[in-house]
Amino acid sequence: YKRQVIKSIKDLVGCGNCEENYEVICSEAIDIRREWRCFIYYDEIYDIKPYKGDYHYTYDPHVIDQIMKDFRTWEERPAACIIDIGVTSDHKTIVVECNDAYSSGDYGLEDFKYARFISARWAQIFEREDPFDFRKYQP
């Protein structure tokens, strides 16, 4: 299920069927002008890729730093995930959503980086050593 703004009953057409029982999280509509996908890999921002929107808007790096600080306090955080951030029409940097690495696309991340990204999460899920975790070789 993808996020969308529901303004009338017609907007619900195609959102599911009677056999499914989705949990739906509602919020007020936000005017997001630009979005980026932050790839989080072992508690660090691995890369940030533009997702969509108006190039005139840019994110506040101090907000990203705070998001990461808060993320690191989450005890059961994934080894790899994505955090989508956006900038609103009034230039506020916000978290749009967070998703597990195994269910996110590469969105322009280089192939070898994406492979390492996915490997980290799968290794964590299956409680195995990550064969592509090269951090152990760094001084």
Enumerate the language-model features and the residues they cover.
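Generic, low-specificity signal for short hydrophobic/alpha-helical stretches with a mild N-terminal bias
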Residues: 20, 80, 96-100
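Functionally constrained cores in energy, signaling, and assembly domains
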Residues: 26, 86, 106
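Nucleotide/phosphate-binding sheet-loop regions of phosphoryl- and nucleotidyl-transfer enzymes
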Residues: 2-13, 99, 104-110, 122
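A short beta-strand motif that forms the metal-chelation/ATP-contact edge
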Residues: 37-40, 91-104
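A long amphipathic alpha-helix within ATP-dependent nucleotide-binding catalytic cores
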Residues: 47-95, 114-138
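Active-site nucleotide/adenylate-binding loops and adjacent lid/helix of ATP-dependent enzymes
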Residues: 2-72, 139
